[in-house]
């Protein structure tokens, strides 16, 4: 502690008995506690550090906003580029008509959910819907809203919809939607509470714009059952389309696309291959065919054989967890 008397300041040990300060004041001696001063300094440094972290997080959020939320005027994808799923494409034509002529529509949906296993073209459908409608396309994913700083995710949701409103007519596409749209857990950890804030902000933003105002939200998920009931009620996400693994007819169309420029042995007809690929996603079929072509080249074969397909499937199974069905 410091003792000041007659213009002199001395540092002395604190006797620390009950009436010490009173005795010093009676004698006109002022005292100060170094510990208190140190605490003040530490508190000030802590406040400065907290402010610096907050400003850095805000800077990162603004940088993320400018670098992540890009709008695309033309996606270059049409419904004709998508194999199969004719019923979904036909149904989406009515949405295209509504997006092009909002004044003629009595009621438009605010949101559409595309659900189904990965690798079957949910993103492709969203891009085609924007291109066919002639509107801007703004794509993001659920993981973009999650981070280490509490409250930042909700801020990003607000940024997303602000940009969408500025770029309308616009389709907002959110991939991996279940990562932010899961059922809320009010008794969970800090991460759960942050996810609750993100979801609540998303609900508020969707409630904040009216249908027919030029913003349509399309969300893709592999787990529709995990979504919060508040999301999928009428007035928010009104429509749901299942983008499933391709059927026999669609697999034959995919073989025509992915097999272009490749030669198959005479026993591998499109019908046989389509049966062999039963149960695989569109992306898995593409991977197996491309890998089979590489195997054909490595063995200097004239055509892709069933052995190439089996070897390719075995190799891809390690990466994609797929199984080949052989006749």
Where are these regions (language model features)?
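Extended, hydrophilic extramembrane loops/domains of integral membrane proteins
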Residues: 4-35
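Hydrophobic alpha-helical transmembrane segments in multi-pass membrane proteins
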Residues: 51-56, 167, 171-175, 287
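AAA+ ATPase "lid" subdomain C-terminal helix
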Residues: 275-307, 314-322
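Proline-centered turn/helix-capping motifs that create local helix->coil transitions or kinks
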Residues: 62, 263-264, 321
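Interdomain "pre-motor" coupling segment immediately N-terminal to P-loop NTPase/helicase cores
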Residues: 34-71
């Amino acid at each position: 502690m410091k003792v000041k008397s007659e213009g002199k300041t001395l540092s002395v040990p604190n006797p620390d008995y009950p009436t010490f300060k009173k005795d010093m004041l009676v004698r006109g001696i002022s005292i100060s506690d170094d510990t208190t001063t140190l605490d003040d300094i530490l508190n000030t440094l802590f406040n400065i550090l907290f402010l610096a972290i907050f400003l850095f997080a805000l800077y990162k959020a603004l940088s993320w906003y400018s670098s992540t939320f890009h709008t695309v005027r033309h996606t270059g994808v049409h419904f004709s580029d998508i194999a199969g799923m004719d019923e979904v494409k036909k149904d989406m034509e009515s949405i295209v008509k509504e997006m092009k002529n909002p004044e003629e529509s009595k009621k438009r949906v605010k949101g559409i959910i595309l659900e189904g296993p990965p690798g079957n073209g949910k993103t492709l459908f969203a891009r085609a819907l924007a291109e066919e409608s002639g509107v801007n396309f703004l794509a993001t994913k659920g993981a973009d809203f999650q981070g280490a700083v509490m409250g930042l995710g909700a801020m990003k949701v607000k940024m997303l919809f602000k940009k969408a409103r500025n770029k309308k007519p616009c389709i907002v596409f959110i991939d991996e939607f279940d990562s932010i749209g899961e059922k809320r857990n009010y008794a969970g950890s800090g991460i759960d509470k942050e996810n609750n804030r993100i979801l609540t902000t998303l609900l508020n933003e969707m409630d904040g714009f009216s249908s027919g105002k030029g913003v349509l939200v399309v969300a893709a998920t592999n787990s529709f059952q995990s979504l919060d009931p508040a999301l999928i009620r009428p007035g928010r996400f009104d429509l749901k389309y299942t983008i499933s693994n391709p059927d026999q007819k669609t697999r034959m169309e995919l073989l025509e696309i992915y097999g272009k420029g490749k030669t198959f042995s005479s026993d591998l007809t499109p019908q046989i291959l389509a049966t062999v690929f039963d149960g695989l996603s569109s992306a898995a079929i593409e991977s197996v065919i491309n890998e089979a072509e590489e195997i054909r080249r490595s063995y200097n074969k004239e055509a892709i054989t069933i052995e190439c397909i089996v070897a390719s499937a075995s190799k891809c199974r390690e990466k994609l967890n797929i199984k080949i069905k052989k006749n």
